[in-house]
């Protein structure tokens, strides 16, 4: 397969990003970009190779510094024809995302009704939710049986996630959405330099389209649309001990979205669980021998039958400096957030870690 490897492509992407917000162009010209061109080029090369390997439709990767909220690399490539991948600028394009699963668990922890060590019975991998069957990915192999909530998250068990929601919220799904709103999930609504970014969209109990099965599918990634940059913003807040800040493409004053998204003890518990995802769960392809990683895999099937496979996380796990999201759009199976997006995350993370002294000097 022939891949577009023109050396100036990553720099073209940077220029597109920096010029996209016309309403504030006069101000932006006076500010310096946060993008690191060297990292942008390297990330583009890694994505090109992975797209070629997977024959995927598109891929997006965003790298952000945890404390400064500066976006250091922002790359998106898509297949324009049967052979070539070219840069695009669909950073405002939203889709369903299974990366909400740890956020659902955080909301459950906030109620005080559950702990990560609590057991849930996933049975043989099929759970009846009114007139629909909720399945785990290994249902045809007999499911996971009884596992802890922490193990359920690491295994991406849909049943474990939803049963945790049942225990924490009972029949009050609106209480769950109230907590998501309190935690600022789906923010920000706009970022200077990213055109047409819209608020994340959720189907809630207040909507006419709400059904008695909507909650079960929402808490695992469906019945919503959210962009990768909005998802990364939340994971970056987890890495930043609960402080959510506005991602920036220009070096400007810090804007705090939420000074504390959740109780510190619950955030600390979730951070331990996200480490476990990588050391013992489906996130192991993101595991690095060079730096400790924490994060979560995600795989959803869209209405057209295609798949979104993702990995979002941060490193070093014990003292996070960078957060990264990788989102890949595939036409067909196999589709694995860990094996596909997690591997890209690892490659980018290791490159940053090896050149850590260089990036810290920026």
What is each PLM-predicted segment?
Residues 1-9:
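Bacterial N-terminal signal peptides that target proteins for export
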Residues 1-2, 16, 21-60, 80-82, ...:
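Extracytoplasmic/periplasmic proteins that interact with beta-lactams or build/remodel peptidoglycan
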Residues 9-17:
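Bacterial N-terminal signal peptides
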Residues 30, 35-39, 59-94, 106-328:
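Beta-lactam-recognizing serine transpeptidase/beta-lactamase-like catalytic domain environment
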Residues 43, 152, 345:
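A helicase ATPase "motif cassette" and its flanking acidic/Ser/Thr-rich regulatory loops
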Residues 101:
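Short, conserved phosphate/pyrophosphate- and ester-handling motifs at nucleotide-, phospho-/glycolipid
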Residues 255-258, 342-362:
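Short, gly/Ser/Thr-rich active-site loops of penicillin-recognizing serine hydrolases
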Residues 330-340:
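A short acidic/glycine-rich loop-to-helix N-cap element
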């Amino acid at each position: 397969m022939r891949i577009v490897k023109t050396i100036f492509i990553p720099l073209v992407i940077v220029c597109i990003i920096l010029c996209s917000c016309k309403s504030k162009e006069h101000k932006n010209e006076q500010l310096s970009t946060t993008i690191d061109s060297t990292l942008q080029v390297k990330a583009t090369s890694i994505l090109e190779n992975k797209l070629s390997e997977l024959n995927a439709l598109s891929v997006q990767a965003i790298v952000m510094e945890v404390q400064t909220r500066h976006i250091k690399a922002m790359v998106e490539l898509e297949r324009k024809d049967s052979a070539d991948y070219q840069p695009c600028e669909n950073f405002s394009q939203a889709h369903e995302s299974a990366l909400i699963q740890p956020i659902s668990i955080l909301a459950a922890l906030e109620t005080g009704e559950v702990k990560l060590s609590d057991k849930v019975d996933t049975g043989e991998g099929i759970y009846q939710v009114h007139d629909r069957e909720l399945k785990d990915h290994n249902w045809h192999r007999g499911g996971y049986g009884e596992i802890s909530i922490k193990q359920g998250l690491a295994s991406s068990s849909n049943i474990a996630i939803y049963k945790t929601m049942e225990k924490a919220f009972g029949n009050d799904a609106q209480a769950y959405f109230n907590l998501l709103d309190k935690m600022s999930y789906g923010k920000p609504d706009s970022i200077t330099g990213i055109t047409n970014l819209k608020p994340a969209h959720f189907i809630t109990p207040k909507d006419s389209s709400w059904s008695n099965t909507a909650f079960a599918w929402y808490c695992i990634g469906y019945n919503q649309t959210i962009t990768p940059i909005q998802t990364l913003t939340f994971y970056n807040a987890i890495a930043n001990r609960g402080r959510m800040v506005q991602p920036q493409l220009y070096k400007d004053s810090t804007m705090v979205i939420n000074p504390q998204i959740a109780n510190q003890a619950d955030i600390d518990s979730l951070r331990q669980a996200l480490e476990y995802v990588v050391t013992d769960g489906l996130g192991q392809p993101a595991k690095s021998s060079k730096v400790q990683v924490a994060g979560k895999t995600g795989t959803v099937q869209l209405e057209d039958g295609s798949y979104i496979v993702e990995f979002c996380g941060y490193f070093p796990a014990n003292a996070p400096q960078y957060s990264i999201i990788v989102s890949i759009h595939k036409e067909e199976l196999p589709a694995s957030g860990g094996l596909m997006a997690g591997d890209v995350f690892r490659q980018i993370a290791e490159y940053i870690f090896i050149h850590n002294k260089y990036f810290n000097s920026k």
